Amino acid sequence: MPRFLQDDDDEIRSPFMDSLSERLLRARTVIISGEITQRLAARTSAQLLALSAEDEAPITMFVNSQGGHVEAGDTIHDLVRYIRAPVRMVGTGWVASAGALIYVSVPRERRYCLPNTRFLLHQPAGGAGGSAADIDIEAREILKMRDRLNQIFSTATGQTIERIEEDTHRNFWLDAKAAVDYGLVGQIIEQETELDGARGRGGKSTGR
């Protein structure tokens, strides 16, 4: 079994960490924690592809992230939808920005969170220097990204694009219950057994 669990700085390489990584993979569990980076996206993509190639049983992904690189989030979002094995998302801590983009890559019935999870949605931000032409190009790309993300979250939550745009014009925080009411979360769970009880609902959904 390949080893994937390691910190971004490669500071921790120990038999214990290797063993923990292998146990998580055997349990078909993927953890996304911290900033969404290209490196994290590459590691997570490798995990997803390896697990799906091995078995089509459900994969459980825990997301606890402050957000980060949108395109890195896109990579994981698309890979979750690409693989055959269904993925169940569990939000914990906070699920913000690009982390929320990853979280909504599965149908609502496979989106769970723990009771104290908080969610943050907002419009993408960017800064550009250089010539006026470069700044104009960057601004237009940000607008296209905003429209694309609004569509993704509208589809995922059932809210209108206009509502998403209005709500996320500034930082839009939701606690677990508010996230359920908004359509972002399917179910709040407190015990692992509640997720185990959902295994029978782990199949692919044609409505995503």
Language model features: what each stretch is:
Residues 1-98, 104-208:
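N-terminal organellar transit peptides
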